[in-house]
């Protein structure tokens, strides 16, 4: 993964679709390496929303009024991801919601970075939440709003964790994941 490429962090929020409440994309946020928002839109998923999952997703019926259609949003998002290192937490769910093959992208996933886990003194865990990593390494609390998660907040947090991982790698003489401005 070494080399020079632009880095973008992504986080998506999903709602339940149909009788089985399968995940459908309802919001996507992208930020650059400096935390500036590149993309943040509510997205009208294909099909009937049967569970807004507001407590977690932060998405309400009002957000769907005038929301960008899934097909349009998907093209916009994939264009922004093209050729970049994509940073996120448990990205497989985001790419599934985008109906996109994650293997077509170069990714950095905070949920699988053992260097971060060790730095946070969590190397005994099987799975680490973004909230716990942020508490331990960024010394800040996220995902604690009664209104649900913010995909912008989560994307910014994963970008900060990526930068911590880069510093750990540099300190230990390990190859960096990507070099960006």
From Swiss-Prot:
Subcellular compartments: Nucleus; Nucleus, Nucleolus; Cytoplasm; Nucleus, Cajal body
Keywords from the named record: Antiviral defense, Cytoplasm, Exonuclease, Hydrolase, Immunity, Innate immunity, Manganese, Metal-binding, Nuclease, Nucleus, RNA-binding, rRNA processing
Entries under InterPro entries matching the protein: Exonuclease_RNaseT/DNA_pol3, REXO1/3/4-like, RNaseH-like_sf, RNaseH_sf
Top-level EC class as recorded in UniProt: hydrolase
Catalytic activities: Exonucleolytic cleavage in the 3'- to 5'-direction to yield nucleoside 5'-phosphates
Role description: Interferon-induced antiviral exoribonuclease that acts mainly on single-stranded RNA. Inhibition of several viruses does not involve the degradation of viral RNAs, but rather the inhibition of translation of viral proteins. Exerts a translational control over a large panel of non-self RNA substrates while sparing endogenous transcripts. This activity correlates with the protein's ability to localize in cytoplasmic processing bodies. May also act as master regulator of over hundred interferon stimulated genes leading to viral genome translation inhibition.
Protein's name in the database: Interferon-stimulated gene 20 kDa protein
């Amino acid at each position: 993964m070494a080399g020079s490429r632009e880095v973008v962090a992504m986080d998506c929020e999903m709602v339940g679709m149909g009788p089985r409440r399968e995940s459908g994309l309802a919001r996507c946020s992208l930020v650059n390496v400096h935390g500036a928002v590149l993309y943040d839109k509510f997205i009208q998923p294909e099909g009937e929303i049967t569970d807004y999952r507001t407590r977690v997703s932060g998405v309400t019926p009002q957000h769907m009024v005038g929301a960008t259609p899934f097909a349009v949003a998907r093209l916009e998002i994939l264009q922004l991801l093209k050729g970049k290192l994509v940073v996120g937490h448990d990205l497989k769910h985001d790419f599934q919601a985008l109906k996109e093959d994650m293997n077509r992208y170069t990714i950095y996933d905070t949920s699988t970075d053992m260097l971060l886990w060790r730095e946070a003194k969590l190397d005994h865990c099987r799975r680490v939440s973004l909230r716990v990593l942020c508490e331990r390494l960024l010394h800040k609390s996220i995902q604690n709003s009664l209104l649900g998660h913010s995909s912008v907040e989560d994307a910014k947090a994963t970008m900060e964790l990526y930068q911590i991982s880069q510093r750990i790698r540099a300190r230990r003489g390990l190859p960096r994941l990507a070099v960006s401005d």
